[in-house]
Amino acid sequence: MTPNAATVLPVAIAGIGAYLPPRVVTNDDLAAVLDTSDEWIRTRTGIRQRHVADPEVATSDLAIAAGKVALADAGLGVEDVSAIVVATTTPDHQVPGTAPLVAAALGTEVAAFDVNAACSGFIYGLRVGGALVATGSGPVLVIGAETLTRIVDPTDRSVAVLFGDGAGAAVLAPDPHGRLGPFDLGADGQDPSMLWCPAGGTRRPVSREVVDAGEHFIVMRGGDVYRNAVARMVAASRGVLEQAGLGVDDVDLFVGHQANVRILDAVAQRLGMDPARSHITVDQHGNTSAASIPLAMVDARDRGRLEPGDTVLLAAFGAGLTFGACLLTWHPDPVGEEGGAR
């Protein structure tokens, strides 16, 4: 079935791309330095390995690499792009944003800005980038990129085993048939300490005391995160399906934020979805926050799980708390001469 035309943006994903650092850290590698084991990690998270960036590699480096692949996949050059949106919670610097650095490296001076919605960031980026395209902009490059291993305490097994580094990107282009949306986004900032870095911002700036206490690292209340992630992703998914006038059986592929396989399984179960429709990459990538959904989309495409015309459901939950979902109709053809995805 086709989503209600009144609820979608006249925008298509014209190309996608991914980049993962070459270094792979397995659960056994972590077990050699932490009080943990491959079995302990797998049974609780589904994670088997994660990619880790070398010390000299920053978030922008990953974003640039993924962006180049996405542009090539779309058959476009950077000169065709009207804006660059980088979704990240691990920027190169507090100031400036990461997107201008990415734009400069790609060779353009178009509008470039960051979106920080944590693990929901890529869906937020699609909404913002899609709106730019829908209101007359040319193609927009949306990138989710993270070096989360830089902000986890390597001695804390509760978080050190969860996260990985990587980047994924999508090129959004005008499409009169409207293939992006609807969206259901939200945030609840009443209890940010559920998943946060306690220090490092203006509330509690970096100091020797902060670093000595490890307060610049991610801390989380795992049980609360699990319950909220499942509830919020289910609610947002139902919201977009209702807006589109679709049922869960109309979804060809579900790509959820790859944080924990138990969360993904619970979301599919509560939606009444066949778990076989859920694409899983958390076992290979770990939690890559804003990069996880585009990385999973590229993996699904490469494995032949995305076909033209497929209805794809994206859903995420992250620090903030932020959450959201969107639908899109997969249409990966390159951008045509008149600017629309063919």
Name what the model sees in each region.
Residues 1-55, 156-227, 231, 235, ...:
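Condensing-enzyme catalytic core mediating Claisen C-C bond formation in acyl metabolism
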Residues 24-25, 95-97, 152-156, 323-327:
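Short acidic, glycine/serine/threonine-rich loops at helix termini
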Residues 34-43, 94-107, 142-148, 202-210, ...:
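Acidic-glycine-rich active-site phosphate/pyrophosphate-binding loop
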